[in-house]
C-alpha cells in the first residue's frame, strides 16, 4: 500500500508529545512490512540543524492563497522519505507558537492535500490529531484516496466552527464543530492509541463534549496500542546510561541507580526505594494528586523521589519547595533532558504515572523496558500495558490504583515501598516487566488491517457510520 503520514510532529526532529514518537517510529516498521510509506510535516525553522541529510526542494504548490515549497529528506535510520512543507509561517523556532496556530495548521493540512492530489498520490492518508483534521473533509471527493484519522489526545480539538469557516471557506455542514469533529465525521477509519481509551472517550467523563459523535461513529472507531522504538530504547545497548543490562543481568542495574542518586544530589544508598517521575507538570499527568500526598509519603517512608519535567508555574514551585524540605531524599529538575530521562528509567526502582487520563502513555512502557516498576492509575493505555502485581500467583508487572483520589495513590505507593523490601520478589517483578514485547510489530499489523478496511469503505462514510 502507498501510505502518507501527515502530522505536526515527527521524532527525532520535532516532538512535544507521544504523537511525535508514533510518526517517527511506525512508518519504519510498515516500510519493513513492504509498504511504500512516506511522511509529510511542516519545515520548522529549527529543523536545519537536526537534519542528517540536507533537504532538497522537489515541488512547489499553492494553497489558501499562498505559495509553498516541498523539500525531501529521510527519516534517520531508514529509507522512509520525509517531505517538509516550507513556508514563512513555519519559521518560528518552536512547533506551537500561539494565536496563529489555527491558520498555520489548516494551511499545512491544505498543503498536504494539494501534494497528494498533484505530486505523490497515496492510497491512504494517515492523519494525526486536529492539525490535519480538514484533510478527510477535502478527500471526501477523492474516491481513490482514503483517510485514517488517529486521535492522540481528544482534549486538543483545534479551531471551532466560527473560526474554521472563516479560515477554510468550507460551509459549516462540511466541518462539524471543530477540525477534530470534522475528521471524525469524514475519515474512513478513526482510531485512538489504546483500546481502553477508545471506549472511554465515548463517555461524558472522557469525551470532551464529543462523546455523542464518537458513539455515533463507533462502527468505524477502534483502539490500537502504541509501541516504542525498542532499538533506540534498549537498556542493553543504550549509550546514555551508565551500565548496560538486560533481564538476565539485572545485577548490573544497581550501578545505574547509584549513578542517578549521585547525579541528582540524593543520598547514595542502594537500599533506598527510588521513585522516578518524568512528565509535563500539568493536571492531566496527575501532578495535582501527587502533591496532595507526596509530603506525607516522604515523611512516612525512607523513599527517594526524583522529578524531571516542566509545566505550570504553580506545580513547579510546589515541587521545588518539597525538594528543599527533603535534601538527599527528593530532587526536582524543572527542564526536559532526553538523556537524563533515560537515566531515570534505568536507575529508578519504580516509576510513577498517576494520570487523570492517558490516551496511551509511553513513559510506563519505557520504564518497563528499563526495569523500573510502574505505579499507575488505571486509565486509558495504562490499563492495557500495566497489570497489578499478584505475588501469590507471580503475575503482573506493576502496581495499579483505580480512583483519582489521594488515599488511593498514597496506599499504592506504600504498598510498592513495602514490597521493595523483599528483593527476590521485586527482581522477579522487574524481570517480568522487561520481558514484555513493547515493539511496534503487533501494532503495525493492526494498522495494516485498518488501512485495508479504509480502502474498502464506500466514500460516503456518513452512511457507513
Swiss-Prot record:
- What are the UniProt keywords, alphabetically? Glycogen biosynthesis, Glycosyltransferase, Transferase
Give the Enzyme Commission number.
2.4.1.21
As its record notes, the protein acts as a catalyst of: [(1->4)-alpha-D-glucosyl](n) + ADP-alpha-D-glucose = [(1->4)-alpha-D-glucosyl](n+1) + ADP + H(+)
- Species name for this entry? Synechococcus sp. (strain ATCC 27144 / PCC 6301 / SAUG 1402/1)
Q: Which domain of life is it from?
A: Bacteria
Per the similarity annotation, which family is this?
Belongs to the glycosyltransferase 1 family. Bacterial/plant glycogen synthase subfamily.
Biological process, per Gene Ontology:
glycogen biosynthetic process
* Role according to the record: Synthesizes alpha-1,4-glucan chains using ADP-glucose.
For this entry, the protein name equals Glycogen synthase
Biochemical pathway: Glycan biosynthesis; glycogen biosynthesis
The record, for InterPro entries, names: Glyco_trans_1, GS/SS, Starch_synth_cat_dom
Q: Which residues bind ADP-alpha-D-glucose?
A: 15
Question: Which NCBIfam families does this one have?
Answer: glgA, PRK00654.1-3
One Pfam family of this protein, by short name? Glycos_transf_1
Amino acid at each position: 500500500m502507498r501510505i502518507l503520514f501527515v502530522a505536526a510532529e515527527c521524532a527525532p526532529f520535532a516532538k512535544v508529545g507521544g504523537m511525535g514518537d508514533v510518526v517517527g517510529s511506525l512508518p519504519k516498521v510498515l516500510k519493513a512490512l513492504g509498504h511504500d510509506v512516506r511522511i509529510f510535516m511542516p519545515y520548522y525553522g529549527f529543523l536545519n540543524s537536526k537534519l542528517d541529510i540536507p533537504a532538497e526542494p522537489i515541488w512547489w504548490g499553492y494553497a489558501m492563497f499562498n505559495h509553498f515549497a516541498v523539500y525531501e529528506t529521510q527519516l534517520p535510520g531508514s529509507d522512509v522519505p520525509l517531505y517538509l512543507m516550507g513556508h514563512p509561517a513555519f519559521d518560528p523556532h518552536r512547533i506551537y507558537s500561539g494565536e496563529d496556530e489555527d491558520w498555520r495548521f489548516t494551511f499545512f493540512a491544505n498543503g498536504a492535500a494539494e501534494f497528494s492530489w498533484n505530486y505523490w498520490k497515496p492510497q491512504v492518508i494517515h492523519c494525526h490529531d486536529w492539525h490535519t483534521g480538514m484533510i478527510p473533509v477535502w478527500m471526501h471527493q477523492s474516491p481513490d484516496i482514503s483517510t485514517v484519522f488517529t486521535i492522540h489526545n481528544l482534549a486538543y480539538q483545534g479551531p471551532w466552527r466560527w473560526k474554521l469557516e472563516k479560515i477554510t471557506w468550507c460551509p459549516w455542514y462540511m466541518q462539524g464543530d471543530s477540525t477534530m469533529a470534522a475528521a471524525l465525521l469524514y475519515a474512513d477509519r478513526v482510531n485512538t492509541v489504546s483500546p481502553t481509551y477508545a471506549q472511554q472517550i465515548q463517555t461524558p467523563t472522557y469525551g470532551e463534549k464529543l462523546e455523542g459523535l464518537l458513539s455515533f461513529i463507533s462502527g468505524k472507531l477502534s483502539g490500537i496500542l502504541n509501541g516504542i522504538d525498542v532499538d533506540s530504547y534498549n537498556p542493553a545497548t543504550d549509550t546514555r546510561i551508565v551500565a548496560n543490562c538486560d533481564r538476565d543481568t539485572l545485577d548490573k542495574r544497581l550501578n545505574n541507580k547509584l549513578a542517578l542518586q549521585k547525579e541528582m544530589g540524593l543520598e547514595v544508598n542502594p537500599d533506598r526505594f527510588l521513585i522516578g517521575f518524568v512528565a509535563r507538570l500539568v493536571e492531566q499527568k496527575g501532578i495535582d494528586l501527587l502533591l496532595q500526598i507526596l509530603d506525607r509519603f516522604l515523611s512516612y517512608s525512607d523513599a527517594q523521589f526524583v522529578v524531571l519535567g516542566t509545566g505550570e508555574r504553580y506545580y513547579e514551585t510546589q515541587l521545588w519547595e518539597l525538594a528543599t524540605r527533603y535534601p538527599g531524599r527528593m530532587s526536582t529538575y524543572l527542564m526536559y533532558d532526553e538523556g537524563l530521562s533515560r537515566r531515570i528509567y534505568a536507575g529508578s526502582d519504580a516509576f510513577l504515572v498517576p494520570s487523570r487520563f492517558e490516551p496511551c502513555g509511553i513513559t510506563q512502557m519505557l520504564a518497563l523496558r528499563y526495569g523500573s516498576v510502574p505505579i499507575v492509575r488505571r486509565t486509558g493505555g495504562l490499563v492495557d500495558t500495566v497489570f497489578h502485581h499478584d505475588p501469590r500467583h507471580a503475575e503482573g508487572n506493576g502496581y495499579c490504583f483505580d480512583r483519582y483520589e489521594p488515599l488511593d495513590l498514597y496506599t499504592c505507593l506504600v504498598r510498592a515501598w513495602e514490597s521493595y523490601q523483599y528483593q527476590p520478589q521485586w527482581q522477579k517483578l522487574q524481570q517480568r516487566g522487561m520481558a514484555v514485547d513493547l515493539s511496534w510489530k503487533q501494532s503495525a499489523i493492526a494498522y495494516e488491517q485498518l488501512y485495508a478496511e479504509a480502502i474498502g469503505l464506500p466514500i460516503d462514510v456518513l452512511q457507513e457510520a
